[in-house]
A protein has these predicted regions:
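Conserved small/polar residues in nucleotide/adenosyl-binding loops
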Residues: 93-95
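Glycine- and acidic-rich phosphate- and metal-coordinating loops
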Residues: 74, 90-91
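Beta-strand elements of well-folded, non-transmembrane domains
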Residues: 10, 78-82
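Helix-adjacent hinge/juxtasegments
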Residues: 59-76
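A short, glycine/Asx- and small/polar-enriched loop/turn
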Residues: 83-90
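Compact, glycine-rich, soluble single-domain proteins
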Residues: 42-61
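N-terminal presequence-like segments and the immediate start of the first folded domain
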Residues: 1-41
Length: 95
């Protein structure tokens, strides 16, 4: 179990703390959704989580085969839809 605590800071911005490590991240609503766009949006983190999860799983598999994947990089595109506003597609560009 991992506990994460979040606080709404106002102005469509939230701070979330990963309790085991004490690390905090901030989300901000994007400009096209009434925010300032000064940080990752919650849906940006959804796309980031998918990409980072895939790269982590690849690294775990590589480590078990004694392969070095240091420097591996990837890219994902997030597509949004409206009515209701939602993520419509996550496109993995490359790993």
């Amino acid at each position: 179990m991992v506990r994460i605590e979040a606080v709404y800071d106002g102005n469509l911005r939230c701070s979330a703390t990963h309790i085991p490590s004490g690390q905090t991240l901030v989300t901000d609503a994007p400009v096209d959704n009434m925010g300032k766009g000064q940080s990752f949006s919650p849906t940006d983190l959804l796309a980031t989580s998918m990409l980072n999860c895939m790269m982590t799983i690849i690294a775990i598999a590589a480590d078990s085969r004694e392969l070095d994947v240091s420097g591996m990089s990837g890219s994902v595109e997030k597509h949004m839809a409206s009515g209701p506003r939602r993520v419509s597609k996550l496109s993995l560009i490359h790993i």
